Curated annotation (Swiss-Prot):
It is found in: Cellular thylakoid membrane. This is Photosystem II reaction center protein M. One of the components of the core complex of photosystem II (PSII). PSII is a light-driven water:plastoquinone oxidoreductase that uses light energy to abstract electrons from H(2)O, generating O(2) and a proton gradient subsequently used for ATP formation. It consists of a core antenna complex that captures photons, and an electron transfer chain that converts photonic excitation into a charge separation. This subunit is found at the monomer-monomer interface. It holds the Pfam family PsbM. It is a single-pass membrane protein.
Amino acid sequence: METNDLGFVASLMFILVPAIFLIVLYIGTNRSEA
């Protein structure tokens, strides 16, 4: 079973980085409004 680790990590980062950015941005706006 051959897996492309680099492609897996790249796709994982492609999903996680925007998700983390949106979560941080969401928490930041909630704290500023509260």
